[in-house]
Amino acid sequence: MPSHPTKPPLRLFATTLWEYPSQHYDPATAQGPASPARPPGWSPGPRMQGDKNYTGATPSWVIWQCLQRYTREGDVVVDPMCGSGTTLDVAADLNRTGKGFDLRPTREDITQADARKLPLPDACADFCFVDPP
């Protein structure tokens, strides 16, 4: 018996990005093997994306839907208002390279920066996910 509640399997929804059965998904059901895009120590299993206690955290299902629809493995995904890092975790689960920025970073892989002036060269991202406060 698993030590964590079973999450529904990941699947693309045909009609909406905003339908999600839980705040987070089980990354063991995410597509793709481990890759250099995944952070050190990543392994499939009972971990969450981002921090469920972070105020305003975007459901990882929503980010997963967007990245599955509009990006490919190896793409660079930028989140200029990264919060607890949910976008970075979902990007890693899907073999995308995540770059996260926030005024008040909550972890080491998020760079402190103002979304109005990110320290990135022009045209360096394949997709930008932002869920402003």
Protein language model regions, located:
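Class I S-adenosyl-L-methionine-dependent methyltransferase catalytic core
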Residues: 1-133
